[in-house]
């Protein structure tokens, strides 16, 4: 396992491309059925794990690039001298700068979470529930009403809470909201949301990193909608959608980045949720094929690294390629071989290396003056 400038460049390029592919995939099919949601969530988790492992392994396949890339790596590999610090490559200085910003972002997220949880502890508990999560463990969930909240949300990895806004809900709407948030808690969505937000905060410098959080949120909300509405009749589904619309009209930014809210997304996401609840459309087979290809690309990206390929001019003058015109071998009487390039004698070989076995071989008598 090695870490170098090449692994960093590979990491940035591949993760950026994969993020674009995943974003385009979910944009083309915003209303996902259960298999589609599984593909998207699997892709998001794999992509997040890929971001955490910017290394080169023993089984890594090297892909050499000879244009532009050598100049880029040469620029970032140049040694610079900062005051009071030892000389080091430019990319190491930039990495330290990026790490410092990532640390500040993580600290900011943690502080926001701590302050909001402390505020919630000051609110009276209106209801309490006991649920069984996906791991078969019993969890106690308490519910509070926040007069300043504009969105219903679930928060807390080990001590989950449901926060309700101080809006005028009917008893049926209140039950539906609670079922939605309890579905998030029982499915482990808070843990997945926490993981994705931490990765996004650390790798803020990866192009299109915001797509990772948006795709995860969309898939989690559709899954919760499915768990809540799959056993409801049409009138109850309409009541559920009316509840979503009521919250969406006054919804603002979620007070904690680690919370899973009833409303997370823009107008397009809300339309997709309405369509899913009312129609339960099926994702096209083409979506599954493309999603599978994206997953395979993510898995293969763990074992690929881009390396610059550059031969200095002074070295190039003393080397040749088997594809060069005028290169050939001459079979000697003693069984050896003479190597010629453009009629210039290069040296004698006792055997033919694999790299030049494609060169034409002439008889010694043909070349003898």
Language-model regions: role of each:
Residues 162-177:
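Short pre-active-site segment immediately N-terminal to the catalytic Zn-binding motif
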Residues 42-60:
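Hydrophobic alpha-helical membrane-insertion segments
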Residues 63-69, 116-128, 215-218, 309-327:
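Alpha-helical transmembrane signal-anchor/signal-peptide segments
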Residues 2, 79-111, 255-369:
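Cytosolic-facing loops and C-terminal tails of multi-pass membrane proteins
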Residues 1-18:
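Hydrophobic transmembrane alpha-helical segments in integral membrane proteins
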Residues 175-196, 221-226:
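Active-site recognition of the HExxH zinc-binding catalytic motif
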Residues 124-125, 211-272:
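Short helix/loop segments within enzyme catalytic domains
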Residues 28-35, 83-166, 307-312:
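Juxtamembrane/interface helices at transmembrane-helix boundaries
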């Amino acid at each position: 396992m090695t870490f170098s400038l090449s692994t960093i460049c590979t990491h940035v390029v591949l993760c950026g491309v994969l993020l674009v592919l995943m974003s385009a995939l979910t944009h083309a099919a915003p209303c996902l059925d259960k298999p589609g949601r599984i593909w998207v969530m699997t892709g998001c988790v794999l992509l997040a794990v890929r971001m955490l492992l910017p290394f080169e392994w023993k089984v890594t396949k090297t892909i050499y690039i000879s244009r532009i890339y050598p100049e880029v790596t040469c620029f970032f590999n140049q040694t610079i001298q900062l005051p009071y610090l030892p000389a080091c490559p430019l990319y190491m200085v930039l990495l330290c700068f990026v790490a410092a910003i990532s640390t500040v972002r993580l600290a900011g997220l943690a502080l926001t979470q701590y302050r909001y949880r402390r505020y919630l502890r000051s609110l009276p508990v209106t209801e309490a529930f006991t649920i069984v999560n996906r791991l078969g463990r019993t969890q106690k969930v308490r519910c509070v009403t926040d007069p300043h909240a504009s969105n219903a949300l679930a928060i807390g990895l080990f001590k989950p809470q449901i926060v309700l806004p101080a809006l005028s809900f009917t008893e049926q709407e209140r039950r539906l909201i609670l079922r939605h948030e309890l579905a998030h808690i029982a499915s482990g969505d808070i843990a997945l949301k926490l993981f994705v937000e931490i990765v996004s905060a650390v790798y803020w410098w990866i192009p299109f990193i915001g797509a990772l959080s948006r795709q995860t949120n969309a898939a989690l909300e559709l899954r919760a909608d499915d768990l809540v509405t799959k056993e409801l009749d049409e009138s109850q589904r309409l009541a559920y959608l009316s509840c979503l619309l009521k919250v969406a009209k006054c919804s603002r930014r979620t007070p904690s980045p680690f919370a899973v809210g009833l409303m997370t997304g823009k107008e397009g996401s809300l339309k997709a949720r309405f369509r899913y609840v009312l129609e339960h459309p099926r994702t096209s087979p083409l979506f599954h094929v493309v999603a599978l290809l994206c997953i395979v690309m993510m898995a293969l990206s763990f074992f690929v690294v881009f390396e610059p390929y550059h031969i200095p001019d002074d070295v190039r003058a003393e080397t040749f390629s088997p594809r060069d015109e005028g290169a050939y071998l001459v079979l000697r009487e003693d069984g050896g071989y003479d190597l010629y390039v453009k009629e210039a004698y290069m040296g004698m070989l006792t055997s033919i290396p694999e790299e030049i076995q494609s060169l034409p071989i002439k008889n010694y008598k043909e070349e003898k003056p």
